[in-house]
């Protein structure tokens, strides 16, 4: 990453990806009660815009305090 890239604005897809990563990173120690509802809402939004029903959540990397979850979406042709 160069100095010029630092000031470059991100595209909407990159911003959405970063936001989704932040949303899906959950603190294990807190055991947030709304995570399951948030997953359902994310699935509903994805289905609204992609018409896909094949959506899976996967745990990617876990350590003592943070669990990272990946969303896999199979898009119909």
Curated annotation (Swiss-Prot):
Record keyword Cell division present: yes
Keyword Hydrolase assigned: no
Any coiled-coil regions, as ranges = none
Q: Which domain of life is it from?
A: Bacteria
What keywords sit in the KW lines?
Cell cycle, Cell division
InterPro entries (alphabetical): MinE, MinE_sf
Entry's SUPFAM superfamilies?
A: Cell division protein MinE topological specificity domain
Signal peptide start and end residues: none
Q: Which Pfam families match?
A: MinE
Q: Name one GO biological process term.
A: regulation of division septum assembly
**HAMAP family hit by this protein:** MinE (MF_00262)
Which family, according to the similarity comment?
Answer: Belongs to the MinE family.
Sum up the protein's function in the record's words.
Prevents the cell division inhibition by proteins MinC and MinD at internal division sites while permitting inhibition at polar sites. This ensures cell division at the proper site by restricting the formation of a division septum at the midpoint of the long axis of the cell.
Please give the name of this protein: Cell division topological specificity factor
